[in-house]
């Protein structure tokens, strides 16, 4: 696997050096690369939608972050320029991963998850605290958020372990279950209930669709629910989020301020929006408008119509992802594709739900929209895995989806 990884890296460098501007163009815009012509059409559509999603996100980030960047750094494009640097790295990561076989990527998943877990543990003695939560560690000028980086490796490793559940030793099962619980517990202690819940949901749903016995699933679900309640009882800021969610207008200038301003932004957009870069709420009324609440700015500037079109993009993305899930004969590949969809689309819907007030404030970023290098790299990683699974779903190896409609349960598809 290491030889293949090195050979692909060397090939990428040779292509860039020999091919000149054409190669640079192809690697920065992989949707234009000739190799994509040989892919399954679903893989090509997923790649096009991924970069459409990214492009919309960069435009919205430019608008949402401009006032804050101008005020803080006297450079309105400060955040966008930094995001573009991370985006270029993410695209290179995307190119590399879509060239690797899934079986090769899975070989590094165990090392990746253990390394990410060790980084997660380092946030306790040497983490940088922001708003009472130590979620980042500094590596020179770069801030690393292990709880974000670990998401792709959780998808990879949980899919691999649960796809082989009946064929692995009891000690190996215990090791990975304890490690998964330790990871979620470490994220929860930071404290970061929303990310811990998302990671737990990923593992639980992958285990569910893999056919793990209901007794174990219900036991884990019960423990998770009790742990979440204990966390809510012990963390004041989490209780305040629930209270502000239930009635933000009761305290519109204190605990309900963030949600009230978000709702005002969404409502101000009406049908067609105020126009690109014409948001009023981003002018220091709506807090963290270029990260957690960037969808509120998007809704204000593009209106209900723009929000509807973006949600339609998510629905199409989800549908194409499910076609990949149902068409691939490999159990581990199906679980991988399902996990990727849950992170990309599920996290997006949670973020949107928070912005419009139907879910409590979580702090989860909107993939490809929210500012943050860790988020953009993790999102590119997850989307590359999904597209790589689609690429490997070759014509001769695909399942006839319509033949599955007569089965009694969707869990039949994962057997």
From Swiss-Prot:
Function: Could play a role in chloroplast division/peptidoglycan biosynthesis.
Family annotation (Pfam families): FTSW_RODA_SPOVE (PF01098)
Protein name listed in UniProt: Putative peptidoglycan glycosyltransferase FtsW
Family: Belongs to the SEDS family.
GO molecular function, one term: lipid-linked peptidoglycan transporter activity
PANTHER family for the chain: CELL CYCLE PROTEIN (PTHR30474), PEPTIDOGLYCAN GLYCOSYLTRANSFERASE FTSW-RELATED (PTHR30474:SF2)
Keyword Membrane attached: yes
Cellular component GO terms, alphabetical: cell division site; chloroplast membrane; plasma membrane
Membrane-topology descriptor: Multi-pass membrane protein
Keyword 4Fe-4S: no
Protein encoded by which gene: ftsW
Catalysed reaction equations from the record: [GlcNAc-(1->4)-Mur2Ac(oyl-L-Ala-gamma-D-Glu-L-Lys-D-Ala-D-Ala)](n)-di-trans,octa-cis-undecaprenyl diphosphate + beta-D-GlcNAc-(1->4)-Mur2Ac(oyl-L-Ala-gamma-D-Glu-L-Lys-D-Ala-D-Ala)-di-trans,octa-cis-undecaprenyl diphosphate = [GlcNAc-(1->4)-Mur2Ac(oyl-L-Ala-gamma-D-Glu-L-Lys-D-Ala-D-Ala)](n+1)-di-trans,octa-cis-undecaprenyl diphosphate + di-trans,octa-cis-undecaprenyl diphosphate + H(+)
TM segment ranges: 12-32, 45-65, 85-105, 108-128, 136-156, 174-194, 197-217, 283-303, 306-326, 338-358, 367-387
């Amino acid at each position: 696997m290491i030889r293949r990884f090195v050979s692909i890296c060397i090939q990428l460098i040779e292509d860039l050096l020999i091919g000149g501007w054409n190669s640079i163009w192809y690697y920065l815009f992989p949707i234009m690369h000739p190799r994509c012509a040989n892919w399954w059409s679903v893989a090509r559509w997923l790649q096009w939608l991924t970069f459409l999603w990214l492009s919309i996100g960069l435009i919205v980030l430019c608008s949402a972050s401009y006032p804050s960047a101008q005020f803080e750094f006297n450079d309105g494009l400060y955040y966008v320029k930094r995001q573009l640097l991370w985006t270029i790295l993410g695209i290179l990561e995307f190119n590399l991963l879509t060239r690797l076989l899934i079986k090769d990527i899975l070989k590094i998943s165990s090392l990746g998850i253990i390394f990410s877990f060790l980084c997660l543990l380092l946030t306790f003695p040497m983490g940088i605290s922001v708003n009472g939560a130590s979620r980042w560690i500094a590596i020179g000028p770069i801030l690393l958020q292990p709880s974000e980086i670990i998401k792709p490796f959780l998808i990879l490793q949980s899919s691999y372990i649960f796809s082989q559940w009946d064929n692995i030793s009891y000690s190996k099962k215990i090791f990975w279950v304890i490690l998964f619980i330790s990871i979620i517990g470490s994220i929860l202690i930071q404290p970061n209930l929303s990310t811990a819940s998302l990671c737990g949901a990923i593992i639980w749903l992958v285990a569910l669709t893999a056919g793990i016995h209901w007794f174990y699933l219900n036991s884990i679900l019960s423990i998770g629910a009790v742990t979440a309640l204990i966390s809510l009882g012990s963390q004041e800021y989490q209780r305040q989020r629930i209270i502000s969610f239930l009635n933000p207008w009761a305290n519109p200038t204190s605990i309900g301020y963030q949600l009230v301003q978000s709702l005002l932004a969404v409502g101000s957009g009406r049908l067609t929006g105020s126009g690109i870069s014409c948001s009023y709420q981003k002018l220091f009324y709506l807090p963290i408008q270029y990260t957690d609440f960037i969808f509120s700015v998007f809704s204000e500037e593009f209106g209900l119509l723009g929000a509807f079109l973006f949600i339609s993009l998510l629905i199409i993305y989800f549908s194409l992802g499910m076609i990949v899930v149902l068409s691939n004969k490999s159990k581990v590949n199906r679980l991988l594709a399902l996990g990727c969809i849950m992170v990309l689309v599920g996290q997006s819907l949670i973020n949107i739900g928070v912005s419009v007030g139907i879910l409590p404030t979580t702090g989860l970023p909107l993939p490809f929209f929210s500012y943050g290098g860790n988020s953009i790299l993790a999102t590119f990683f997850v989307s590359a895995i999904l597209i790589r699974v689609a690429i490997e779903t070759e014509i001769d190896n695909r399942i006839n989806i319509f033949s599955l409609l007569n089965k009694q349960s969707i869990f039949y598809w994962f057997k």
